[in-house]
C-alpha cells in the first residue's frame, strides 16, 4: 500500500513539473511584416512619350501613361522561392486591352468607309515603269496583275448630287461581284466595319513600362533559363517592368527582349511554342515604289485618301534577312524544339496559303503606316533555305484593307504612304505551333500568329503582381496588460516602398526586429507613389480628359489610401492602433501552427512561409482578437466608472464639501422626520388603548418584579438590567440622541467585523501553517521515496557489477586454464613423438 501511494505521489509530482514547465503562448499582432499574396489589380503605365510628337504611340502614351521613374528601384529577395505562370498572367491580358485601346484611339477620329461599299467597275492596272535598269524580277507568288483601276459613283458635298471618281486598289482588297461585267466591291463590306486610318497616322512603337499601384508590388524572376512556369529561386521586387515595345507582328517576334542564357522555348502544354533568342537577327524591309496619293470626297465632311498613280514597280516590297545569322539560330532552335517535344522525327515547314488568313500564313507587320504581308517559306522550309543565297529575300505584299486583330469583324483601310519606305527591325524570337501528339509518328512545326497576347506573355513571363499584406499574427510569450491606458506612437516617413520587402528572406525573429522601419517604409512608399501619380496627373490633366486612364490612375491613388486606412481600422478594432508589435489576451492554439515549436517558428521560418502555414486559420484568429478587444473595452468602461476613487484629494474641495453638507442635512431631516412620525404613531396607539399621554420630561421607571428588592445606597441588592428611559425634549437633544445611538450601533458593528476579520486571519494562518506542514511532510516523504529508490538502484547496480565481475573472472579462469592445456599439449608433442619412436624400436 505504501509503495502504491509513493508511486502515485511521484506521478503527481512529475505531472506538476510538466504543467509548470509548459509555457503558455499568446497571439501577438505584428504590423509591417514582409508578406505578400498573388493579386489582380489595374496597373498603370509609364513611358518617355513626347507630347509634341504626332505619332500614334506618343499621343496615346502621353494621355495614358505617367513619366518614367529616373531612378528605378529593384530589391533582391534572398532565400525566397516564388512560383510564376506566364500562361495565366493577368498582366498580359491587361496589356492586350491597352494595345487595343491604343489602336482604337489612334483610329477614333478617322472616316468609316461604309459609303464605299458600292458597285465598282474595275480594270487591270500595272503602273508606270520608271526605267528598265531599276526594275527587278517580280517574285512568282506576287503575281503580275497587282492593281485594279476602279470607277464608282460617290456622293459630293451635296447629298443629292453624285459624281464618278477613280481610284487604284490592290487585287487582294477587292472581290468580284460579276466576273463577266467586271464589277467589284471592297473585300470587307459584307463582314466587317471598315475604318480609314487617318492620313497622318503612323505606328512607331515606343517602350512602355507597366507599374504596380501603391499597396502592390511586381515580383520579378531573374533566372536566365526560366521557362515561365514553375518555381524561381532568384527573385526580386520592382515597381515597374522593363520597357516593352508593343510591336504587332505574326510568326516573328520583332524588337522584343533577349534571353541572357541561351535559347529558351516556352510551351503551354497544348500546341503553342514561344521561342526567345539570346541573339538578334536583323530584318530590313523596303518598299521602293513611289505611290502618288490623292483624295476623293465621298460625302459631306468625308474624304477618302486613294492611290491615283504608282511610279515604278507597284508591288516591289521585300525583306532581307542575313542567311549567315539566320541559319545557325534556326538550327539551334530546331534542336531545342526536339528536346522540348522529346522527338527527333519533326518536320519544320512554313504554312500553306490555304491554312488560314493571310495574317497567319504570312509575316504581317506595320512599316511606317503600310501593312506588309511577307512570305516566310525561305526561312522555314529547309529545301528553300538551302537554295537561298545571301541574303534571304522575302517577297512581301502590301494591303490597304486589313483585318484588325483588336476586334473580331473589324477592318482598317490604310491610306497610301508616299515615298520610299524602309524599316529595320531585330528578330528576337518566334511564334510557332506544332501538330501531332506524343502518340503520333510525325510532328509538324510551323510558324503561327494572330493571338497577340502571346507576344505580351513573351515579355511579361518573368513578372507577376502581388498585394502587400503587412498585418501578421504569431505566437508570443508576452500577454497584454489589461485595462491600462497607454500613449499611442505615431509613424514617421521613411525610405522607399520596395525596401518593405527587403527582409522577406529573413527568419521571423530577424525580420521582427525591423518592423518599425518596415512600417515606416510601407507608409512612406505609399506617399511617394501617390506624389508621383499626382504630379503626373497634374501635369497631364488637360490631356487626361480625353482618356479613361486618368480615372484609372485616380482610382489607383484612392485604392492605396483605402488599403492603408483599412489596415489601420483593423488594428484599431484590435486595440493595436499605432503599434508595430501588439500583444493580446488570446491564448495561442498549437493546432493553428500544426504543433510547430516556438523556436522553429521564430528561427527557421520566414514570414511568407509562416503566412502560408496559418492562412486557413486567419479568420478564426482575427475573430478571437476582436472579441478579446471588445471584452477589454467593457472592462475599461467599468474601470472608468470607478475612476474617481483614484483621486481622493478631490474629496476635500469646496464643491465636494457643499455637496456633503447638503447630503448631511437631508439625512438629519430624514431622521427627524422619521422620529416625529414614530412618536405620533405611538401616541395615537396609546390614546386608542385609553391612556393619556404623559409629559415628555417625565422619567418612566421600568417595572420590577415583586420579589426583587430595590438597590440600596451601597449598591447592594439585586440590580435589575432595566434602566429608566429618558424622554428628551428639544430638537438638538433629539438629534444628539439619535446620532449617539447610530454611532454606538456602528461602533458595535465595526467591532464585530474586526473580531470576525481577526478570527478569519487566524484560521487562514492556521490553514496556511497546516498546508506548509503538509507540504513539508510531502517533501520529506518524496525525499524518502527518492532516497529509497536511489538506494535500490545503487544496490542493484552494485549487485550487477559484482555478478558481472564474477562471471568475467570465472570466464577468464576457464580461458586461462584452456590456454594452459593447449600450451602443455603443444609442449608434450616432442615427448609423445619420442615415446612413439621408442615403442616402435622395441
Curated annotation (Swiss-Prot):
Disulfide bonds: 45-65, 110-198, 117-189, 122-150, 211-240, 221-232, 285-319, 367-423, 374-396, 576-582
Cellular compartments per GO CC: host cell endosome membrane; host cell plasma membrane; membrane; viral envelope; virion membrane
Sequence ranges on the Cytoplasmic membrane side: 685-842
InterPro entries linked to this entry: Gp120_core_sf (IPR036377), Gp160 (IPR037527), GP41-like (IPR000328), HIV1_Gp120 (IPR000777)
Residue window of motif YXXL motif: 691-694
Glycosylation site positions: 79, 123, 131, 134, 149, 153, 181, 190, 225, 229, 234, 255, 267, 278, 284, 290, 320, 331, 345, 375, 386, 422, 426, 589, 594-595, 604, 616
Pfam families assigned to the protein according to its UniProt record, in alphabetical order: GP120, GP41
Example GO biological process: positive regulation of plasma membrane raft polarization
Keyword Transmembrane included in the entry's annotation: yes
Renumbered residue ranges of the record's region MPER: 641-662
Location of region: V3: 285-318
Region of interest called V2, as start-end residue ranges on this chain: 150-189
Gene3D superfamilies: 1.10.287.210, Human immunodeficiency virus 1, Gp160, envelope glycoprotein, Single helix bin
Signal peptide (residue range): 1-23
Post-translational modification: Highly glycosylated by host. The high number of glycan on the protein is reffered to as 'glycan shield' because it contributes to hide protein sequence from adaptive immune system. Palmitoylation of the transmembrane protein and of Env polyprotein (prior to its proteolytic cleavage) is essential for their association with host cell membrane lipid rafts. Palmitoylation is therefore required for envelope trafficking to classical lipid rafts, but not for viral replication.
Segments for region (Immunosuppression): 552-570
Chain segments carrying region CD4-binding loop: 353-363
Family per record: Belongs to the HIV-1 env protein family.
The protein's name in its UniProt record: Envelope glycoprotein gp160
Protein source organism: Human immunodeficiency virus type 1 group N (isolate YBF30)
Classification lineage: Viruses, Riboviria, Pararnavirae, Artverviricota, Revtraviricetes
Gene assigned in the entry: env
Amino acid at each position: 500500500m505504501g509503495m502504491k501511494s509513493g508511486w502515485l505521489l511521484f506521478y503527481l509530482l512529475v505531472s506538476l513539473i510538466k504543467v509548470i514547465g509548459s509555457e503558455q503562448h499568446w497571439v501577438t499582432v505584428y504590423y509591417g511584416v514582409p508578406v505578400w499574396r498573388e493579386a489582380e489589380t489595374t496597373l498603370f503605365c509609364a513611358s518617355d512619350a513626347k507630347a509634341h510628337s504626332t505619332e500614334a504611340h506618343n499621343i496615346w502614351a502621353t494621355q495614358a501613361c505617367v513619366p518614367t521613374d529616373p531612378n528605378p528601384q529593384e530589391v533582391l529577395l534572398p532565400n525566397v522561392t516564388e512560383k510564376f505562370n506566364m500562361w495565366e498572367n493577368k498582366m498580359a491580358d491587361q496589356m492586350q486591352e491597352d494595345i487595343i485601346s491604343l489602336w482604337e484611339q489612334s483610329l477614333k477620329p478617322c472616316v468609316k468607309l461604309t459609303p464605299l461599299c458600292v458597285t465598282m467597275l474595275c480594270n487591270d492596272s500595272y503602273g508606270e515603269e520608271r526605267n528598265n535598269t531599276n526594275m527587278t524580277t517580280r517574285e512568282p507568288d506576287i503575281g503580275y496583275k497587282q492593281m485594279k483601276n476602279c470607277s464608282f459613283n460617290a456622293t459630293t458635298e451635296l447629298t443629292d448630287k453624285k459624281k464618278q471618281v477613280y481610284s487604284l486598289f490592290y487585287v487582294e482588297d477587292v472581290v468580284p461581284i460579276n466576273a463577266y461585267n467586271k464589277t467589284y466591291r471592297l473585300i470587307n463590306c459584307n463582314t466587317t466595319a471598315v475604318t480609314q486610318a487617318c492620313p497622318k497616322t503612323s505606328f512607331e512603337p515606343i517602350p512602355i513600362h507597366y507599374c504596380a499601384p501603391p499597396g502592390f508590388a511586381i515580383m520579378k524572376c531573374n533566372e536566365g533559363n526560366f521557362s515561365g512556369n514553375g518555381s524561381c529561386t532568384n527573385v526580386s521586387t520592382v515597381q515597374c517592368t522593363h520597357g516593352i515595345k508593343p510591336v504587332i507582328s505574326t510568326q516573328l517576334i520583332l524588337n522584343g527582349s533577349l534571353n541572357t542564357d541561351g535559347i529558351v522555348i516556352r510551351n503551354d502544354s497544348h500546341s503553342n511554342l514561344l521561342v526567345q533568342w539570346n541573339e538578334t537577327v536583323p530584318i530590313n524591309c523596303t518598299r521602293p515604289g513611289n505611290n502618288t496619293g490623292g483624295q476623293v470626297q465621298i460625302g459631306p465632311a468625308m474624304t477618302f485618301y486613294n492611290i491615283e498613280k504608282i511610279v515604278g514597280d507597284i508591288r516591289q516590297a521585300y525583306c532581307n534577312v542575313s542567311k549567315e545569322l539566320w541559319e545557325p539560330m534556326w538550327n539551334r532552335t530546331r534542336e531545342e524544339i526536339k528536346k522540348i517535344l522529346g522527338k527527333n522525327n519533326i518536320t519544320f515547314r512554313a504554312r500553306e496559303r490555304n491554312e488560314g488568313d493571310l495574317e497567319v500564313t504570312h509575316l504581317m507587320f506595320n512599316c511606317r503606316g503600310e501593312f506588309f504581308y511577307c512570305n516566310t517559306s525561305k526561312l522555314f522550309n529547309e529545301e528553300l533555305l538551302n537554295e537561298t543565297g545571301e541574303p534571304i529575300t522575302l517577297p512581301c505584299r502590301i494591303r490597304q484593307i486589313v483585318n484588325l486583330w483588336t476586334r473580331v469583324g473589324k477592318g482598317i483601310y490604310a491610306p497610301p504612304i508616299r515615298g520610299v519606305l524602309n524599316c529595320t527591325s531585330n528578330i528576337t524570337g518566334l511564334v510557332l505551333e506544332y501538330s501531332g501528339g506524343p502518340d503520333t509518328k510525325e510532328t509538324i512545326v510551323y510558324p503561327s500568329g494572330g493571338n497577340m497576347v502571346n507576344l505580351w506573355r513573351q515579355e511579361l513571363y518573368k513578372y507577376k503582381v502581388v498585394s502587400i499584406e503587412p498585418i501578421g499574427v504569431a505566437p508570443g510569450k508576452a500577454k497584454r496588460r489589461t485595462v491600462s491606458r497607454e500613449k499611442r506612437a505615431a509613424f514617421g516617413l521613411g525610405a522607399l516602398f520596395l525596401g518593405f520587402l527587403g527582409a522577406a528572406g529573413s527568419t521571423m525573429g530577424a525580420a521582427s526586429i525591423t518592423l518599425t522601419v518596415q512600417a515606416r517604409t510601407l507608409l512612406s512608399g505609399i506617399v511617394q507613389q501617390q506624389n508621383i501619380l499626382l504630379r503626373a496627373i497634374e501635369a497631364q490633366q488637360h490631356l487626361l480628359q480625353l482618356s479613361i486612364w486618368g480615372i484609372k490612375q485616380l482610382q489607383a491613388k484612392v485604392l492605396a489610401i483605402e488599403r492603408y486606412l483599412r489596415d489601420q481600422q483593423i488594428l484599431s478594432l484590435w486595440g493595436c492602433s499605432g503599434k508595430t508589435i501588439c500583444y493580446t489576451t488570446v491564448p495561442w492554439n498549437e493546432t493553428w501552427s500544426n504543433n510547430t515549436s516556438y523556436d522553429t517558428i521564430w528561427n527557421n521560418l520566414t514570414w511568407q512561409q509562416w503566412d502560408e502555414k496559418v492562412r486557413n486559420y486567419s479568420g478564426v484568429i482575427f475573430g478571437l482578437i476582436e472579441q478579446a478587444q471588445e471584452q477589454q473595452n467593457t472592462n475599461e468602461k467599468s474601470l472608468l466608472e470607478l475612476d474617481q476613487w483614484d483621486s481622493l484629494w478631490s474629496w476635500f474641495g469646496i464643491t465636494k464639501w457643499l455637496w456633503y453638507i447638503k447630503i448631511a442635512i437631508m439625512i438629519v431631516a430624514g431622521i427627524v422626520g422619521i422620529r416625529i412620525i414614530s412618536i405620533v404613531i405611538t401616541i395615537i396607539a396609546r390614546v386608542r388603548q385609553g391612556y393619556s399621554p404623559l409629559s415628555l420630561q417625565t422619567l418612566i421607571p421600568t417595572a420590577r418584579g415583586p420579589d426583587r428588592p430595590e438597590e440600596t445606597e451601597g449598591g447592594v441588592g439585586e440590580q435589575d438590567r432595566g434602566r429608566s428611559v429618558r424622554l428628551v425634549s428639544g430638537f438638538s437633544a433629539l438629534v444628539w440622541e439619535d446620532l449617539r445611538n447610530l454611532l454606538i450601533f456602528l461602533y458595535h458593528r465595526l467591532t464585530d467585523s474586526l473580531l470576525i476579520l481577526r478570527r478569519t486571519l487566524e484560521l487562514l494562518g492556521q490553514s496556511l501553517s497546516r498546508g506548509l506542514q503538509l507540504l513539508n511532510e510531502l517533501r520529506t516523504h518524496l525525499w524518502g521515496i527518492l532516497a529509497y529508490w536511489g538506494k535500490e538502484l545503487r544496490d542493484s547496480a552494485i549487485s550487477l557489477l559484482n555478478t558481472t565481475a564474477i562471471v568475467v573472472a570465472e570466464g577468464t579462469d576457464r580461458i586461462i586454464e584452456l590456454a594452459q592445456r593447449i600450451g602443455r599439449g603443444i609442449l608434450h608433442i616432442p615427448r609423445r613423438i619420442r615415446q612413439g619412436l621408442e615403442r616402435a624400436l622395441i
